[in-house]
Amino acid sequence: MAKLTKRMKAIKAGVDSTKAYEINEAIAVLKQFATAKFDESVDVAVNLGIDPRKSDQNVRGATVLPNGTGRSVRVAVFTQGANADAAKEAGADLVGMEDLAEQIKKGEMNFDVVIASPDAMRVVGQLGQVLGPRGLMPNPKVGTVTPNVADAVKNAKSGQVRYRNDKNGIIHTTIGKASFSAEALTQNLQALLAALVKAKPTTAKGIFIKKVSISTTMGAGVAVDQNSL
């Protein structure tokens, strides 16, 4: 087992793993230990009251955080005609059809999000083995297959996060940067949780949001008292 660094020992000593912190206190703890030489991301893990083995209880979707994520996002769009012009005007970094597909087949993957209009899926479908494993395959459930590509581009650029539970029924995503104010991070977390509640499967019973923890890229997890949200 790898030895803990002095920094990680200090972080672990400063976080009470048995306690659920009030949100402002939780954020203060994160900021206290966010001492890396870069602006660390603030990530969230949400334990859901679902049975991930049942397909009708899996949760997947996307929402735009009111204060963004602090990340610069490059967007590729598969579309044509007037939609291509609209996508470019909305800020898309790459727009095309077969030409864009050829770039991707050659390994040119300089983007973070892929959006497609429905008529372009015949082209995108050929890229499943490349885009799928990277979590980049467009999907209507998260709004990346849409006739309104311009709005999808704007959402991606303005702080949209996509979420999907893992095999343990936990959602992992980001809600901003350590440099964000406590208010901005709280608003982003509230927006994410509201989106998750709306996405609750009808077959899920009992408490839906069971636990919420936040952490920075290089820090320990801090449990959040949901009553403080």
Curated annotation (Swiss-Prot):
CDD domains: Ribosomal_L1. Part of the 50S ribosomal subunit. Binds directly to 23S rRNA. The L1 stalk is quite mobile in the ribosome, and is involved in E site tRNA release. Protein L1 is also a translational repressor protein, it controls the translation of the L11 operon by binding to its mRNA. HAMAP family: Ribosomal_uL1_B. InterPro entries: Ribosom_uL1_bac-type, Ribosomal_uL1, Ribosomal_uL1-like, Ribosomal_uL1/biogenesis, Ribosomal_uL1_3-a/b-sand, Ribosomal_uL1_CS. It comes from the Bacteria. One of its GO terms (molecular function) is structural constituent of ribosome. Keywords: Repressor, Ribonucleoprotein, Ribosomal protein, RNA-binding, rRNA-binding, Translation regulation, tRNA-binding. GO terms for biological process: regulation of translation; translation. Belongs to the universal ribosomal protein uL1 family. Signal peptide: none annotated. GO terms for cellular component: cytosolic large ribosomal subunit. The keyword tRNA-binding applies. It comes from Mannheimia succiniciproducens (strain KCTC 0769BP / MBEL55E). This is Large ribosomal subunit protein uL1.
